[in-house]
């Protein structure tokens, strides 16, 4: 009699075979996660697929808690698992013990975790950024000794600002020894008393650029006292060195542009300053000319004697006062002498007279000396003021060969006020001349 198996019996037998096969107890699988779900219990459910096949999988909470990343839909992963059968559905599936991102994905995960850590510690804060000097004298360039990056940086700096001194510091930018070499070269550049440091290299994969994501490289850049421009990779490439540097440049060429001013723009600025200064000086001179012409038109300068007439009168008044004081003093002395003659006996009269004469003589000498000194000082002051007035006098100016130009009874102070065939009058030291303007020449033409 033929014996039939139940579905559950067959399923259990197949599961038994799977579980007894040592090749299925620990398999290494590479694939892409799909239909990923995290159950409220903490277990993970998903499919692992490649271009041709799909297999169901799950990971218990205990193993899932040990993962160093958060799995998600589309992740390329490397899995260590055992293969067995889920009896209830009769499906075979994998029970995952370990899981990690495959290759580049793992690097991106590591990069993201380190970025979050450094950001939390304040390494990327804008408040820590240093300003790039506008007019550097020395720039240190850290990059490979050959390649497009160094050529682009040097040629751009030479074209924009040839005055700056470039210090080339060759460094490894890729490979296992590059990390330590980059750190040492940055520290060396920081000791050279340069104004700016450019750290750069050409583009590449995340593996090629990884040395610029190393934590100790990032911290070396952060601790550098010299402003640093990071120019690692192309515009779409980002490294942690870009975030910690004072300025990030999309390319090595842009780094050179950021580090230097444009010599042609500077020349244009200098010309603008020169024009502004020249215009200001001309305006100032014109203003001073107008002030001088305005002052020279004062009535007192046309008749200089009015300036010192009062001084002469004041001097005469002082002289009169001094003479009056002197005469008064003499009269008082005479009166005093007379009283003395009356008060003393005849025997002492000659002696008293002699003493009074000496006193009067000394007093007279002192008064005469005071009066003479005052008169001399007044004459000196008057002479100095007369000389100052004569120097300002239009007449004295004409004595040195200058002439005053008048048109329609007004003084002409600029060639801009004259036209050809205008009738003018030239006033000189000994008379005046009528003339006709034949040609006008202006200094600013």
Curated annotation (Swiss-Prot):
GO molecular function terms attached to this record: exodeoxyribonuclease VII activity; nucleic acid binding
Signal peptide as annotated in the record: none
EC number: 3.1.11.6
Keywords: Cytoplasm, Exonuclease, Hydrolase, Nuclease
InterPro entries reported for this sequence: Exonuc_VII_L, Exonuc_VII_lsu_C, OB-fold_nuc-bd_dom
Pfam name, any one: tRNA_anti_2
UniProt GO cellular component terms: cytoplasm; exodeoxyribonuclease VII complex
Domain of life: Bacteria
Main location: cytoplasm
GO biological process: DNA catabolic process
Compartmental location: Cytoplasm
Residues forming coiled coils: none
Catalysis performed (reactions): Exonucleolytic cleavage in either 5'- to 3'- or 3'- to 5'-direction to yield nucleoside 5'-phosphates
NCBIfam families on file: xseA
PANTHER family per record: EXODEOXYRIBONUCLEASE 7 LARGE SUBUNIT
Family note: Belongs to the XseA family.
Subunit structure: Heterooligomer composed of large and small subunits.
Function according to Swiss-Prot or TrEMBL: Bidirectionally degrades single-stranded DNA into large acid-insoluble oligonucleotides, which are then degraded further into small acid-soluble oligonucleotides.
Record-given protein name: Exodeoxyribonuclease 7 large subunit
Naturally occurring in which organism (per UniProt): Staphylococcus epidermidis (strain ATCC 35984 / DSM 28319 / BCRC 17069 / CCUG 31568 / BM 3577 / RP62A)
């Amino acid at each position: 009699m033929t014996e039939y198996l139940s579905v559950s019996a067959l399923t259990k037998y197949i599961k038994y075979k799977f579980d007894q096969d040592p090749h299925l107890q620990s398999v290494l699988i590479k694939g892409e996660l799909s239909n990923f779900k995290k159950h409220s219990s903490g277990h993970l459910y998903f499919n692992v697929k490649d271009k041709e096949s799909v297999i169901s999988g799950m990971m218990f909470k205990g193993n899932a808690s040990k993962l160093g990343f958060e799995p998600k839909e589309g992740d390329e992963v490397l899995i260590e698992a055992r293969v067995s059968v889920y009896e209830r559905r009769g499906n075979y599936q994998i029970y995952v013990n370990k899981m990690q991102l495959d290759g580049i994905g793992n690097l991106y995960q590591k990069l993201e975790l380190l970025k979050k850590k450094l950001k939390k510690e304040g390494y990327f804060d804008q408040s820590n950024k240093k300003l790039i000097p506008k007019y550097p004298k020395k720039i240190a360039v850290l990059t490979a000794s050959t390649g497009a990056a160094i050529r682009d940086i040097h040629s751009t700096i030479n074209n924009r600002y040839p005055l700056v001194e470039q210090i080339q510091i060759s460094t490894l930018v890729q490979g296992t020894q590059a990390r330590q070499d980059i750190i040492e070269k940055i520290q060396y550049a920081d000791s050279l008393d340069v104004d700016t440091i450019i750290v750069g290299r050409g583009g590449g994969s995340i593996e090629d650029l990884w040395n610029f994501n190393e934590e100790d490289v990032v911290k070396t850049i952060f601790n550098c006292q010299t402003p640093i421009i990071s120019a690692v990779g192309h515009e779409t490439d980002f490294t942690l060195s870009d975030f910690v540097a004072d300025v990030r440049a999309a390319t090595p060429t842009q780094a050179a542009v950021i580090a230097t001013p444009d010599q042609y723009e500077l020349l244009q600025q200098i010309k603008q300053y020169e024009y502004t200064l020249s215009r200001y000086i001309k305006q100032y001179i014109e203003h001073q000319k107008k002030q001088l012409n305005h002052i020279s038109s004062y009535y007192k300068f046309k008749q200089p004697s009015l300036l010192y007439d009062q001084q002469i009168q004041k001097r005469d008044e002082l002289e009169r006062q001094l003479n009056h004081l002197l005469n008064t003093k003499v009269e008082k002395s005479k009166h005093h002498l007379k009283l003395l003659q009356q008060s003393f006996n005849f025997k002492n009269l000659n002696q008293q007279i002699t003493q009074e004469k000496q006193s009067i003589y000394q007093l007279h000498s002192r008064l005469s000396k005071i009066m003479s000194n005052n008169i001399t000082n007044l004459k000196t002051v008057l002479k100095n003021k007369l000389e100052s007035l004569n120097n300002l006098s239009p007449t004295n100016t004409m004595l040195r060969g200058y002439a005053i130009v008048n048109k329609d009874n007004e003084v002409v102070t600029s060639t801009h006020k004259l036209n050809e065939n205008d009738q003018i009058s030239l006033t000189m030291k000994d008379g005046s001349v009528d003339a006709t303007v034949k040609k006008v020449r202006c200094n600013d033409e």
